[in-house]
Structures are given as structure tokens and as C-alpha cells.
Swiss-Prot record:
UniProt name for this protein: NADH-ubiquinone oxidoreductase chain 4L
Free-text function comment from the UniProt entry: Core subunit of the mitochondrial membrane respiratory chain NADH dehydrogenase (Complex I) which catalyzes electron transfer from NADH through the respiratory chain, using ubiquinone as an electron acceptor. Part of the enzyme membrane arm which is embedded in the lipid bilayer and involved in proton translocation.
GO molecular function ontology, one term from the record: NADH dehydrogenase (ubiquinone) activity
Compartment(s) where it occurs, according to its Swiss-Prot or TrEMBL record: Mitochondrion inner membrane
EC identifiers of the protein: 7.1.1.2
């Protein structure tokens, strides 16, 4: 494993740990998800370029489109929750509360 792959894997792992540990605010969760998607995009692009997969060259662009859609939906959810509840705490999103 080269240093490029190790750094990208470390970025993905750091974003995943941030998502699992700091779940109090919705904005921090969205930032961690964006970090994970960005590291997956870079890993997929580097792998395709190193292995000369010409048939899979559209896959990183498709992943980037899905990441942009996920970011737009996440930001709209953040605006809706902050307008409704006044904060962006994740515990306010629990549907089982009375």
C-alpha cells in the first residue's frame, strides 16, 4: 500500500470516526459524511488512473453527483430542522419522543 492510499484511507477512517463519535450536531455529521465521500472519490479516481480502467472512468463522476445530491438534501434538512426546533441537535430528530 503506497502512501497515497494510506493517506486516503486515513482520511476516510478519520471521517468515519468523527461521524460515529460526534453525533450531537447535524452539521458535524454532514461534514463527516462529506469527508467520507470526498475520500472515496479520490480513492476511486487514483485506483482507476493507476490500473488504467478505461471502462470505469465515469464512476468517480457518478459518485460525485450522488455526493452533491446528498449534500443538498442534508443542507435542506439542516435548514428545516433549525427553523422548526431552533437548534441543529440530532437528539431533536428522535421520532420516538413524546
Amino acid at each position: 500500500m503506497t502512501m497515497v492510499y494510506a493517506n486516503i484511507f486515513l482520511a476516510f477512517t478519520t471521517s468515519l470516526m468523527g461521524l460515529l463519535m460526534y453525533r450531537s450536531h447535524l452539521m458535524s455529521s454532514l461534514l463527516c459524511l462529506e469527508g467520507m465521500m470526498l475520500s472515496l472519490f479520490v480513492m476511486m479516481t487514483v485506483t482507476i488512473l493507476n490500473n488504467h480502467f478505461t471502462l470505469a472512468s465515469m464512476a468517480p463522476i457518478i459518485l460525485l453527483v450522488f455526493a452533491a445530491c446528498e449534500a443538498a438534501l442534508g443542507l435542506s434538512l439542516l435548514v428545516m430542522v433549525s427553523n422548526t426546533y431552533g437548534t441543529d441537535y440530532v437528539q431533536n430528530l428522535n421520532l420516538l419522543q413524546c
